[in-house]
A protein has these predicted regions:
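C-terminal amphipathic alpha-helical segment
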Residues: 285-366
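Loop-centered beta-sheet repeat module
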Residues: 237-286
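His/acidic/aromatic-lined binding-pocket segments of jelly-roll/cupin-type domains
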Residues: 179, 188, 200-202, 207-210, ...
């Protein structure tokens, strides 16, 4: 006899606002609603496209996620958006899918599918969501550079973001200091994520960045500079001093790919939009937050945890972080497939479709669950008894139970994440 399933109110809503819930309703696995839910894991899963973090959580956010990736999908927001959790099984911002059932639309969190059909959802290689994929956008410096145009020397204004920050740090003009403070609030904090084994109750977090858009002069901070000691860093950190002169600053352009192992000090600078695949974890330790005041007070710092988690020894070169795409498949009529990152935590692949390379074939039985994020153009996705067009800014979760599928496009790019 099939085991009964109990759907608690944390699971299903048949109201778009989430106000009407199935409460403690005991439903047999053989019931039509359960069969409909399980059947979802044999088709592409389309997450709600507005899975955004609120400004209080990501106060450094900008407008690019809405303007460049979501507005044409009918999504608007009056708030800045720092993060869009595109492929997520994390309880903080889980993906929610729609299921048409008996004349209504159910809003189905990924946790329901994970409970009902974990093998069809994840595949044979894992029993929970193995990765998390976000689009991040840090606020722009363009308006501040315009404000500074007649206030500082042109050769200073032409500097990259980090060098401009350093140049402005010694300026005592009240107007310039106020502009500088606003500029710094567009950077993400200097932070680190723990390695496996650093803490019993805090999972590791290794991640990668694919730069989607970058303002001129924008960049990232990655790793300690040559010659900086653990003791020097700790003294400045505990004094609340600016830590960025101790880190490598790297100017970036669209298309660049970086791999950030857990334990690496880093920060995302202003003026960037990037895709971030990572381990399913949100453990972040802040070492420095630019003097930011958010919701009326400074955000919490994690100084002891930073000291425990950071890798202090080893290679300090920036070349270790940058990944060079490796073309693994290119033939007439087929897509251009490039491996961007292939590590034990996840694999990241870029699929390019153009008039002479217009079709990609995949098999989620072989790979397990996949995440697809469309960063350019439109695509058509085809599978057994399934065909649908997707647009730039949409993401697709490919469950293991789908199996064979194909993607067609002519001027399109998508990023694929697998375990």
């Amino acid at each position: 006899m099939d085991k009964d399933i109990i759907l608690y109110n944390k699971y299903l809503s048949n109201d778009p606002q989430g106000l009407k819930w199935f409460e403690n309703e005991k439903i047999s696995r053989r019931s039509p609603i359960i069969r409909a839910l399980i059947a979802m894991t044999t088709e592409p899963l389309i997450p709600q496209a507005d899975n955004f973090t609120p400004p209080r959580r990501t106060p450094w956010g900008g407008t690019e996620i809405i303007e460049n990736y979501k507005a044409h999908l009918g999504i608007a927001s009056s708030d800045v958006v720092g993060e869009s959790w595109e492929i997520s099984g994390h309880p903080s911002f889980p993906n929610i899918f729609s299921c048409d059932y008996s004349g209504t639309t159910l809003k189905v969190p990924i946790s329901v599918l994970s409970d009902l059909a974990p093998n069809d959802l994840y595949g044979k290689y894992c029993d929970s969501m193995p990765f998390l994929v976000k689009i991040l956008n840090s606020g722009s410096w363009k308006e501040y550079r315009d404000l500074l145009h007649d206030k500082i020397a042109p050769n200073v204004l032409e500097k990259n973001n980090h060098d401009l920050h350093i140049a402005l740090s010694d300026n005592n003009d009240p107007t310039i200091r106020d502009i500088h403070t606003q500029m710094l609030a567009k950077n993400l904090s200097v932070q680190v994520h723990p390695k496996k084994g650093d803490f019993i109750d805090k999972p590791s977090k290794t991640e990668a960045w694919v730069i989607l858009d970058a303002e001129e002069g924008a960049g990232i901070y990655l790793g300690l500079r040559q010659g900086i000691t653990k003791e020097q860093f700790e003294i400045k950190m505990r004094e609340g001093k600016d830590l960025t002169p101790l880190l490598n600053f790297i100017e970036v352009t669209a298309g660049d790919v970086y791999f950030i192992p857990a334990g690496t000090l880093h920060a995302i600078g202003a003026g960037l939009t990037l895709l971030e695949p990572q381990e399913t974890s949100e453990t972040t330790f802040r070492a420095y937050d630019w003097g930011r005041i958010s919701n009326g007070k400074p955000r919490q710092l994690h100084l002891d945890e930073t000291m425990t988690s950071t890798i202090w020894n080893g290679d300090r070169s920036t070349e270790q972080y940058k990944k060079q795409p490796h073309t693994c498949h290119e033939s007439e009529g087929s897509s251009i497939v490039e491996t961007l990152v292939e590590e034990k935590e996840f694999k990241l692949t870029r699929i390019t479709l153009d008039p002479s390379h217009s079709e990609y074939f995949g098999d989620s039985v072989k790979t397990g669950i996949q995440g697809l994020v469309i960063t350019e153009g439109d695509i058509e996705l085809h599978a057994k008894n399934y065909s649908r067009i997707f647009k730039k800014g949409q993401s697709i979760m490919i469950p293991a139970g789908l199996g064979m599928f194909s993607i067609i496009g002519t001027n399109s790019t998508l990023l694929q994440i697998t375990a």
